[in-house]
Design a protein with these regions (language model features):
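Beta-strand segments within the central parallel beta-sheet cores of soluble alpha/beta enzyme folds
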Residues: 29-33
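Residue-level structural signal for beta-strand termini and adjacent loop
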Residues: 49-50
Length: 207
């Protein structure tokens, strides 16, 4: 894993040197490169004063929001445009999800109605789509599905159950949000563990 700007020198010689010195089974199988990280659309530079030390950013906002802001700004080969507005928005989204998890309790799932079957089917589809995106290193797409598209589906479901004045849906919401937290875990491991605990689990979600 390296920077895109090193393809024409260091990384090329890395491959050539291995091919010249070692037998084929020891040659590199794959090199993953990423783009540059911009700050508010501009190249990071000490002279411009737009560099935020990593320790400072983590201290002020937490590791998970910083990580998610970078991932959500671009796919792997693209330049990531980092900005504090995105960090604040993601931090707020994580706090909202954490609060929601604290209100949900495990419960029996009654006879499924049409909207229940719909949201459970959408959740299964999301698992497949997000898994495929992660396997193909489309991390921005995967994260967008977890944080935002998932939210849209849940919002539609909640409108349907409110219209019917249904009350006993905690079991379904708990199951769906447990799935969502499990998928969020590789991207935001710290807050995902907090959410998992709020959902009443004892073991780590990362297990």
């Amino acid at each position: 894993h390296s920077g895109r700007d090193l393809v024409q020198n260091h990384l090329s010689f890395f491959v050539l040197n291995h091919a010249a010195i070692f037998e084929e089974k020891l040659w590199p199988k794959e090199i993953v490169v990423n783009g540059s990280v911009m700050m508010d659309g501009a190249k990071m530079s000490k002279s411009m004063g737009n560099i935020i030390p990593l320790r400072t950013a983590i201290r002020d906002h937490g590791a998970d929001p910083i990580r998610l802001a970078i991932i959500s700004s671009a796919e792997l080969l693209q330049d990531a445009d980092f900005n504090m507005e995105s960090v604040s928005g993601i931090k707020s989204k994580l706090e909202s999800l954490l609060d929601e998890c604290s209100t949900l309790k495990k419960g029996e799932i009654d006879d499924l109605q049409t909207e229940d079957k719909w949201i459970l089917s959408k959740t299964q589809s999301k698992i497949e789509e997000i898994t495929e995106a992660v396997e193909k290193m489309r991390l921005r797409e995967a994260l967008h599905e977890i944080l935002f598209t998932f939210e849209s589906d849940l919002s539609w479901y909640q409108k349907r159950i409110q219209a019917k004045e249904r009350k006993n849906v905690s079991g379904i919401l708990h199951q769906i949000n447990s799935t969502r937290v499990a998928m969020l875990s590789p991207f935001a491991p710290h807050v995902a563990e907090e959410m998992w605990e709020k959902l009443g689990n004892v073991e780590l979600v990362s297990k």
